[in-house]
């Protein structure tokens, strides 16, 4: 676990302390009564069950004392308190919505915003700053496993980073969630983490290479600062988020081969352009507007001509202008700083700001409408002048382009006037396009900076895209955003649910597929598929007159009521904006408004202004529009690159571009390993610490959090390759996988996991991987860490022990030296006052004074030698200095080499990884091949058993095939008869159609014939359907027979193919095994070599780092030490000279005293003896002193030699410096100790000399006492020497015992570590149990401690005994193995004969066992089924087991107490047993030595056996010579065998060629069949479509005929009515004179209108375009007629006053006129409809003709293919004949071989009888050859049988091809019949069409005839009028005279 102190002040926000967790986990709890119940406010509340369920309902009491009655199904179980505040919700006991919500609520209340949820991380927006993103937190999470550290976004990022390095695979992090959930903040934290972690350890020199510009920062800083720059231009305030990303981005952070940061790039998606010019209330525009207007940089206001009030500018003041807790001025400084870090130049920054400022002025441009015109003009030019100035264009040109754009009409350009609305729209479109292009340029410029050109190998992509949005007004942008989130959610579902479970199936895991019901494909299809929302939108954008209403109508027509995800808007009075449709997304139902969607999708621009921008003096603006391709182009600008204009670029819409970018994004994501972070919105008010339970639950359901936890719990989220698992976790139990034998990786994994004390139901084995439940891999990692810690601890203990033992030895030496000094001082103090000693001290220097000169001369000579040696040492020192210089140079060279090696290290690591992967793959392939080899061997055995059965079945199948052929012939005849009937019926149908056409000339006859034809047609269709059913039934039977035949063919083909495959696979397997073995050896050697090289390099690096720096210092220290030793040596020599001089003086004085005593005569014999002894002692001391001097000189010389040797070795090899240094230090310490001892002895002697001189001069009279004390001193010295020798021997013995004890301790420590490991496992289990038994925790821990101590002792003792026993048994086993091996070799050859005989019997038995095995397999499957059922029942019993586990804990506790008492009693016994075991170990050691001796004797015996074997081989060769006569026949047989093998190989080659040709023909035939079936299906489909079209046409024609007939009847009635009116008008001629004149004018106008209509009909036939214009003219003429009718009505109204008598007649005439107009309009519409139908029929006729031609072409191609198939079949028949001849030849050869075999068997029997005299071994050899020949004969027979099978297969294939050819011919005939039928139908339709035209012309003639009659009536009326006028004139003339009279 992580040390929380590393996190500092952030610890409390990530993980609670131990005390706090104990308070939460130890709350009293009743698991049976505590539940969750639904609540209206908090979604779920805690409650206690009061009464049990009655009638499905339960009474509960909540925490606030409310009593509720709820249904039992509404309750959800509650987890124990120990599961509160869980960091991973997948670990919950009861996984439900209430538990997840409660856990998130508890953690959020403590500001722990991150929580794991299975395989992904959930984060809740805190709406406040938390100190969890500091540098200390980043450092703490680096390199931590997920199970160690608390949940955090850094943990997910670090996991992705480590997965990238470990798996060598690209990673991605998908940070998703609704808008305002905190995605952008988490994205910034992830990028910050990667930038810091990937750059840790870089020195200043390395960071210098990441500088982008002179003023820019490092790559890490640039990546981090890219966010503020993009947020300023792409983020804005929305209703739910103050810093909402209004664009999507996918940031790829690239890393080098070693994980170092290399570069980065950014892809942006769908910037919300509408926000540039429009904001909803409560929202704000992009941040950069308000940053510029903040006034933080006054120079910007001056440069951009802007004020500081946002409300002065229309584009940014439609919503709010400020955001709480956001300082726009500080944000401007941060943005400017970020652009500096990113390397933006001053000109580039100014250009960006100028464009933004120009857009603000752009929005203030005002326009007004000219008086009396619809054209707009500028209402002031101040804003336009400012915008033009900032954009670097002319203000006049800009206004002219906006007000009078040039439009292309044909090949010319026309200046067009614009209305105010059009100008305002064009200004907004230009502003949006300019801002969008500026943003994309900004992203590309940032990518240019982040591209460092460093080598990059992997990347981690971070996706931050706009979250799901449900606003009050949802437009086109929201649809695109929500569609993107829908795709991402489906990707998450596929990765989490579908792909995960498919992986289980591929690996063979026992898994039942779980459908979690989150398929979002219907919604995605609704949006993106053809005829989807976007498709319809793009289609509408193609039509010029399309509108929002037409778009909405098409949406309703295609999806309303048809798609469950498309709904019509529900009425809602609260809704402020109108919604046109609703879409059911995964996050909810979203209403959309389609206002302006067509314009947004087309995104048109004013193409007159764009060239002005392209010529702008602002280079950035000109660059933005440099690659503009058309008015609808949405291609992003690419600065500096001239791209070719694509033809379709101008037609690409926003939706198309968005779909392309989204598909690219999904492709990138699918190529990575994703890591998901789900962001949650806690509440909609942005209040910190408040959680809306219903809102959170909705997001949890939609985001798949609950389903993710469930599948994580039920599935296996962790998996490893077997080789990787073996390599990584073998350390957990090395003994489970022996080193001396090969063990497959899977078997090794099974053994390793089986040997561990873990839950074995938590993992499963797949084909190539081992799968783990959630949490188990973390447990294994903890066990591995513990094991490594123990190993390292043991290694450290050994090292520390060694160092302490050395220190202890040094301390012992110092103690012995102190003891010696103390003893000498005590002895000296004891004798210094003795008179004789005083005399001795005086006399000693006087002795042997004569030798002082000689010694002085020797010392001088020695001094000269030492000076020479000093000169030599000085020369050597100079050599060492030179060597040091060379070593320094070599060190520099090595540093350069090291740098080169570091440069190549990445490649070496990559090659190593590739080699390891290839090794793993090869091992898996070897395993697979070995398994396949075993399977193939079993299959071979089965095939051998089934061979005879198949031969019998072949004969039966031949009979069946003959029967089937007869049946097929019958079916073919029936089929031919059926086709003839169908053809006859078709002809009859054609005749009936002709009859129907003839009967249509008259009305009554037409109706009757039509009804009869319909009845006959229905009957014929019934008959045809019956015949079709019979045909289908027959075809089904034929298909069944073909299927059965095909199955037999496939079975045989599979058998043959399997055999060939087995033979080839066997060879390939053998070759692959050998190649794999060689490759493996080579790889192992390379790996060893690389490992050794790497270790040498590491050693060199370490040695250079540790020794190279100290080299000069060490040499100087050695030189100084040598000089010190020289000085000490000189001082010691001088001291020794003084001592010798004093000794000589003492000796002289002693001699003088002795002479005086002799002269005095007082000397006794005892005194003389004492003097002799003293002289002898003095001589001994002198010799010891000389020996010490010589030893010291030798030591000094050795020191010099070692120093010289060490310097030489240092110059030769740098790697041995450390060992030499240690050795020198050891020797130096020993020398120092010796020098110290000598110095101490010299000082002792000097003090003794001085005291002796003093005593000799002072106490000469006490000579006798001195002699006695000298004797005592001599005795004490002898005792000291003996004691010293005894101590040395004891020291050696103690050292030996110490080494034995150390070896014993090491053995016991090994046992102790293994015991500690098992005890650690027990401790972990007890800790888990102690969590469940909280009250017993402390007691169990105390008992465990005591148990651990006793268990360690017991394990140590038992491990030592087991180790010794294992060694003994291993030695015995080796001896037995060698003995049995060589005994088995002697009898092996005799057993081979018996084994060969047994094999023949075993083959039959194996064939029987194969059948039994199949039956057993079925029974085992049934048992497995039962076992699974029992396991499912066992799962229900786990709760009872858990409860019983508590009782077991109590029992364990009592048992442990008893075990403790027993351990205490057994401790002493174990101690005694340990001593006995040690003695036994010594005995076993001797036994082991004896066994080794016996092993060597066995090896000698082996050599003897080899020599005997060689002799036996020579005897066998002699016997072989003796039976050479019989060998000739064998040679002949071998020659025949070789000949047969040659023929066999030829036949095999021919057979393979035939098989290849056959397979080729099979593929061709299958392809032809497939093409024919496709053609047939296409023709059938087209026939069905044409039948349906013909039926519709027939109905339309019928309706047209009926309508024409009705119009004719109406015309007839109108004519009769006209005649009647004509007569009436003639009768009332005098009353209607004025009315007749008006009627005449009206008739003339109607006649003119009729002529115009006829002209229009002719013009409509000319072309479709002219028809539209004529239709417009007709409408105008109709309006004119209506106006004229109104005038006529007015005139008639005037006449009403004058002509009251003609009122009724006028009305009748007006009604007649209206009826005539209606009839004319009706006739016109009917004629128009007939012409349209005619054109449509002509088009259909052309299509049918084309299709008929295509069918004919396909028929011709099919005939050619059939002919080719016939020729191929003929060729195959010839090949079959050849194969039959070959088969006959093989049969004859077989008989010949059988005869030869019989003869050879006879000869063999004779040879056997003759060879019996030669010995048993020769017989065995011949029998082996006979067996080989028999095997070869069997192989030849098998091959012959296979050849026969191939011949039969070819015969069957030829028959199949013939049959298939016949089928193809029949199909072609049927197709020809269908084509003929179609042609006949086309002809009938043509006839019907001609008849309809004829009828129309007849009606037109009738109409013309009626018109002529009307004209005649009008002429007669005119004549009558003239006559009436004449009569009136006459009457007036007649009346005039009368008046005069």
Swiss-Prot record:
Residues 1930-1941 have a biased composition (Basic and acidic residues). Residues 1887-1941 are annotated as: Disordered. It is found in: Membrane. Residues 846-1935 form a coiled coil. ATP binds at residues 177-184. The keyword Chaperone does not apply. GO terms for molecular function: actin filament binding; ATP binding; cytoskeletal motor activity. Residues 84-785 form the Myosin motor domain. It holds the Pfam family Myosin_tail_1. Residues 30-80 form the Myosin N-terminal SH3-like domain. Residues 788-817 form the IQ domain. It is a peripheral membrane protein. InterPro entries: Kinesin_motor_dom_sf, Myosin_head_motor_dom-like, Myosin_N, Myosin_S1_N, Myosin_tail, P-loop_NTPase, XRCC4-like_C. SMART domains: MYSc. One of its GO terms (biological process) is regulation of CAMKK-AMPK signaling cascade. Involved in muscle contraction. The cardiac alpha isoform is a 'fast' ATPase myosin, while the beta isoform is a 'slow' ATPase. Belongs to the TRAFAC class myosin-kinesin ATPase superfamily. Myosin family. This is Myosin-7B.
């Amino acid at each position: 676990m992580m040390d929380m102190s590393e996190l500092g002040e952030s610890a409390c926000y990530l993980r609670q302390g131990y005390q706090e967790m104990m308070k939460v986990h130890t709350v009293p709890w009743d698991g049976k009564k505590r539940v969750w119940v639904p609540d209206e406010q908090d979604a779920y509340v805690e409650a206690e069950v009061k009464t049990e369920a009655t009638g499905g309902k339960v009474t509960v009491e909540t925490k606030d004392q409310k009593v509720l009655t709820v249904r039992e199904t509404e309750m959800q179980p509650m987890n124990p308190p120990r599961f509160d505040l869980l960091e991973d919700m997948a670990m919950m006991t009861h996984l439900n919505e209430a538990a997840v919500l409660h856990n998130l609520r508890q953690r959020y209340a403590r500001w722990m915003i991150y929580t794991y949820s299975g395989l992904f991380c959930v984060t809740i927006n805190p709406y406040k700053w938390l100190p969890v993103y500091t540098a200390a937190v980043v450092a703490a999470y680096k390199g931590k496993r997920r199970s160690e550290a608390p949940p955090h976004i850094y943990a997910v990022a670090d996991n992705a980073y480590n997965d990238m390095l470990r798996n060598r695979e690209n990673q991605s992090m998908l940070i998703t969630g609704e808008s305002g959930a905190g995605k952008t903040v988490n994205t910034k934290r992830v990028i910050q983490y990667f930038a810091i972690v990937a750059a840790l350890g870089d020195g200043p020199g390395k960071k210098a290479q990441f500088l982008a510009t002179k003023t820019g920062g490092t790559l890490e800083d640039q990546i981090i600062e890219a966010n503020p720059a993009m947020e300023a231009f792409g983020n804005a305030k929305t209703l739910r988020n103050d810093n909402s990303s209004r664009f999507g981005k996918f940031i790829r952070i690239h890393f080098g081969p070693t994980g170092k940061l290399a570069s980065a790039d950014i892809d942006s998606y769908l910037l919300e352009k509408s926000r540039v010019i429009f904001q909803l209330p409560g929202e704000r525009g992009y941040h950069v507007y308000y940053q510029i207007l903040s006034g933080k940089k006054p120079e910007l206001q001056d440069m951009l001509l802007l004020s500081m009030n946002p409300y002065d500018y229309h584009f940014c003041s439609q919503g709010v202008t400020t955001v709480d807790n956001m300082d726009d001025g500080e944000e401007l400084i941060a943005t400017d700083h970020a652009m500096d870090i990113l390397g933006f130049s001053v000109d580039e920054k100014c250009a960006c700001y100028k464009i933004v400022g120009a857009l603000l002025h752009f929005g203030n441009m005002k326009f007004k409408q000219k008086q009396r015109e619809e054209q707009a003009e500028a209402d002031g030019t101040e804003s336009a002048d400012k915008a033009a100035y900032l954009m670097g264009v002319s203000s006049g040109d800009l206004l002219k382009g906006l007000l009078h754009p040039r439009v292309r009409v044909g090949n010319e350009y026309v200046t067009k006037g614009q209305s105010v609305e059009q100008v305002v729209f064009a200004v907004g479109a230009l502003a949006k396009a300019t801002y969008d292009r500026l943003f994309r340029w900004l992203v590309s410029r940032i990518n240019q900076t982040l591209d460092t050109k460093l080598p990059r190998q992997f990347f981690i992509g971070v996706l931050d895209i706009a979250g799901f949005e449900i606003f009050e007004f949802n437009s086109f942008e929201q649809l695109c955003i929500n569609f993107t989130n829908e795709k991402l959610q489906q990707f998450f579902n596929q990765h989490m649910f579908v792909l995960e479970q498919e992986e289980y199936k591929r690996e063979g895991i026992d898994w039942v597929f779980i459908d979690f019901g989150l398929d979002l494909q219907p919604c995605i299809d609704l949006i993106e598929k053809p005829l989807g929302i976007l498709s319809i939108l793009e289609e509408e954008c193609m039509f010029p007159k399309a509108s929002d209403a037409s778009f909405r109508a098409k949406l309703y027509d295609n999806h309303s009521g048809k798609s469950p995800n498309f709904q019509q808007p529900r009425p809602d009075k609260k809704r402020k904006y109108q919604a046109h449709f609703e879409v059911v997304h995964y996050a909810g139902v979203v209403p959309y408004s389609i206002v302006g969607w067509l314009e947004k999708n087309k995104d048109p621009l004013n193409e007159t202004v764009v060239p002005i921008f392209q010529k702008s003096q602002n280079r950035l603006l000109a660059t933005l529009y440099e690659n503009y391709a058309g008015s609808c182009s949405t291609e992003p600008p690419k600065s500096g690159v001239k791209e070719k204009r694509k033809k379709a670029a101008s037609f690409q819409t926003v939706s198309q571009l968005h779909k392309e970018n989204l598909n690219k994004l999904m492709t990138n994501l699918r190529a990575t390993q994703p890591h998901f972070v789900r962001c949650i919105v806690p509440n909609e008010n942005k209040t910190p610490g408040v959680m809306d339970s219903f809102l959170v639950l909705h997001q949890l359901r939609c985001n798949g959090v609950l389903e993710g936890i469930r599948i994580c719990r039920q599935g296996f989220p962790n998996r490893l390759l077997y080789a990787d698992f073996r390599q990584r976790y073998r350390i957990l139990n090395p003994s489970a996988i022996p080193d001396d034998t090969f063990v497959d990786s899977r078997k090794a994994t099974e053994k390793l996991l089986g040997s561990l004390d873990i839950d074995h139901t938590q993992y499963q084995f797949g084909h190539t991987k081992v799968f783990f439940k959630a949490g188990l891999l973390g447990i294994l990692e903890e066990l591995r860490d513990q094991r490594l810690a123990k190993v390292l601890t043991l290694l450290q203990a050994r090292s520390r022990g060694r160092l302490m033992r050395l220190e202890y030895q040094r301390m012992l030496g110092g103690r012995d030296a102190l003891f010696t000094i103390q003893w000498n001082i005590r002895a000296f103090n004891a004798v210094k006052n003795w008179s004789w000693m005083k005399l001795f001290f005086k006399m000693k220097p006087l002795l042997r004074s004569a030798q002082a000169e000689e010694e002085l001369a020797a010392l001088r000579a020695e001094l000269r030698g030492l000076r020479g040696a000093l000169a030599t040492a000085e020369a050597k020192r100079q050599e060492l200095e030179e060597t040091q210089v060379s070593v320094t140079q070599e060190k520099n060279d090595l540093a350069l080499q090291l740098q080169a090696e570091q440069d190549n290290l990445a490649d070496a690591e990559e090659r190593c990884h590739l080699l390891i992967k290839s090794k793993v793959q090869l091992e898996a392939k070897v395993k697979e091949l070995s398994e396949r080899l075993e399977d193939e061997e079993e299959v071979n055995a089965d095939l051998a058993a089934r061979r005879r059965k198949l031969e019998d079945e072949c004969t039966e199948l031949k009979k069946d095939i003959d029967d089937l052929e007869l049946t097929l012939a019958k079916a073919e005849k029936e089929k031919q008869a059926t086709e003839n009937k169908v053809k006859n019926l078709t002809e009859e149908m054609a005749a009936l159609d002709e009859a129907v056409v003839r009967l249509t000339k008259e009305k009554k006859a037409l109706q009757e014939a039509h009804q009869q034809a319909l009845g006959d047609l229905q009957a014929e269709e019934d008959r045809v359907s019956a015949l079709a059913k019979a045909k289908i039934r027959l075809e089904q039977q034929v298909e069944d027979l073909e299927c059965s035949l095909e199955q037999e063919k496939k079975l045989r083909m599979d058998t043959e193919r399997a055999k060939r495959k087995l033979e080839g696979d066997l060879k390939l397997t053998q070759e692959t095994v050998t190649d794999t073995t060689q490759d493996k050896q080579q790889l192992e050697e390379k790996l060893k070599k690389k490992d050794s090289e790497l270790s040498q390099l590491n050693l060199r690096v370490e040695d250079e780092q540790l020794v190279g720096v100290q080299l000069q210092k060490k040499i100087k220290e050695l030189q100084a030490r040598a000089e010190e030793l020289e000085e000490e040596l000189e001082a010691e020599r001088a001291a020794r000279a003084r001592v010798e001089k004093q000794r000589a003086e003492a000796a002289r004085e002693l001699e003088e005293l002795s002479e005086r005593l002799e002269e005095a005569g007082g000397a006794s014999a005892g005194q003389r003896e004492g003097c002799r002894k003293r002289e002898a002692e003095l001589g001994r001391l002198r010799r010891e002193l000389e020996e010490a001097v010589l030893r010291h000189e030798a030591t000094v010389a050795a020191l010099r030699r070692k120093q010289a040797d060490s310097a030489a070795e240092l110059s030769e090899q740098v790697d041995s410096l450390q060992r030499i240094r240690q050795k020198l230090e050891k020797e130096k310490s020993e020398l120092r100790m010796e020098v110290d001892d000598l110095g101490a002895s010299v000082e002792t002697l000097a003090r003794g000399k001085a005291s002796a001189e003093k005593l000799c001069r002072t106490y000469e009279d006490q000579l006798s006492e001195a002699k006695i004390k000298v004797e005592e001193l001599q005795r004490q010295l002898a005792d000291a020497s003996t004691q010293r020798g005894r101590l040395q021997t004891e020291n050696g013995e103690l050292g030996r015992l110490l080494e034995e004890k150390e070896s014993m301790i090491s053995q016991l420590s090994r046992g102790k570590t293994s015991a500690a490991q098992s005890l650690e496992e027990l401790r972990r289990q007890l800790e888990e149990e102690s969590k469940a038994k909280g009250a017993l925790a402390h007691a169990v821990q105390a008992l465990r401690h005591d148990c651990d101590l006793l268990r360690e002792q017991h394990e140590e003792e038992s491990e030592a005994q087991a180790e010794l026993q294992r060694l003994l048994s291993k030695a015995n086993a080796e001896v037995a193995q060698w003995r049995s091996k060589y005994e088995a070799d002697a009898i092996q050859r005799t057993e081979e004969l018996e084994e060969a005989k047994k094999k023949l019997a075993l083959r039959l038995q194996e064939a029987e066992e194969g059948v039994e095995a199949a039956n057993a397999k079925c029974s085992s499957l049934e048992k497995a089924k039962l076992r699974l059922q029992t396991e499912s029942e066992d799962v229900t019993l786990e709760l009872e087991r858990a409860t019983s586990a508590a009782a077991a804990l109590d029992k364990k506790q009592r048992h442990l107490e008893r075990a403790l008492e027993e351990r205490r009693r057994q401790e002493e016994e174990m101690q005694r047993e340990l001593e006995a075991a040690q003695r036994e170990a010594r005995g076993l050691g001797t036994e082991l030595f004896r066994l080794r001796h016996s092993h060597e004797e066995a090896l000698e015996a082996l050599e003897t056996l080899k020599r005997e074997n060689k002799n036996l081989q020579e005897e066998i060769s002699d016997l072989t010579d003796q039976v050479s006569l019989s060998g000739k026949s064998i040679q002949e047989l071998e020659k025949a065998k070789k000949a047969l093998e040659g023929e066999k190989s030829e036949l095999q080659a021919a057979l393979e060629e035939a098989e290849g040709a056959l397979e080729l023909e099979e593929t061709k035939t299958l392809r032809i069949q497939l093409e024919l079936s496709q053609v047939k299906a296409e023709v059938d489909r087209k026939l069905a479509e044409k039948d349906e079209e013909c039926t519709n046409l027939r109905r339309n024609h019928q309706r047209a005929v009926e309508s024409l007939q009705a119009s004719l009847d109406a015309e007839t009635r109108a004519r009769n009515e006209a005649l009647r009116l004509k007569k009436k008008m003639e009768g009332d001629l005098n009353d209607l004179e004025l009315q007749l004149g008006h009627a005449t004018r009206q008739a003339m106008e109607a006649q003119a209108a009729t002529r115009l209509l006829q002209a229009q009909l002719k013009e409509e036939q000319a072309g479709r375009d002219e028809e539209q214009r004529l239709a417009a003219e007709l409408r105008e003429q109709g309006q004119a007629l209506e106006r004229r009718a109104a005038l006529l009505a007015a005139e008639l109204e005037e006449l009403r006053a004058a002509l009251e008598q003609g009122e009724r007649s006028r009305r009748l005439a007006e009604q007649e006129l209206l009826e005539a107009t209606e009839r004319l309009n009706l006739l016109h519409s009917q004629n128009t409809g007939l012409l349209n139908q005619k054109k449509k029929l002509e088009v259909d006729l052309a299509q049918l003709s084309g299709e008929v031609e295509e069918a004919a072409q396909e028929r011709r191609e099919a005939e050619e293919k059939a002919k080719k198939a016939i020729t191929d079949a003929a060729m195959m028949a010839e090949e079959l004949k050849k194969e039959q001849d070959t088969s006959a030849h093989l049969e004859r050869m077989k008989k010949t071989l059988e005869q030869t075999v019989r003869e050879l068997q006879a000869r063999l029997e004779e040879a056997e009888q003759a060879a019996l005299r030669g010995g048993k071994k020769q017989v065995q050899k011949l029998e082996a050859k006979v067996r080989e020949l028999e095997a070869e004969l069997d192989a030849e027979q098998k091959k012959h049988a296979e050849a026969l099978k191939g011949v039969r297969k070819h015969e069957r294939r030829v028959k199949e091809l013939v049959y298939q050819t016949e089928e193809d011919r029949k199909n072609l005939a049927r197709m020809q019949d269908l084509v003929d039928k179609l042609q006949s139908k086309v002809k009938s339709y043509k006839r019907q069409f001609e008849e309809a035209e004829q009828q129309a012309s007849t009606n037109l003639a009738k109409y013309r005839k009626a018109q002529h009659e009307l004209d005649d009536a009008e002429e007669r009326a005119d004549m009558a009028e003239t006559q009436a006028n004449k009569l009136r004139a006459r009457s007036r003339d007649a009346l005039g005279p009368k008046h005069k009279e």
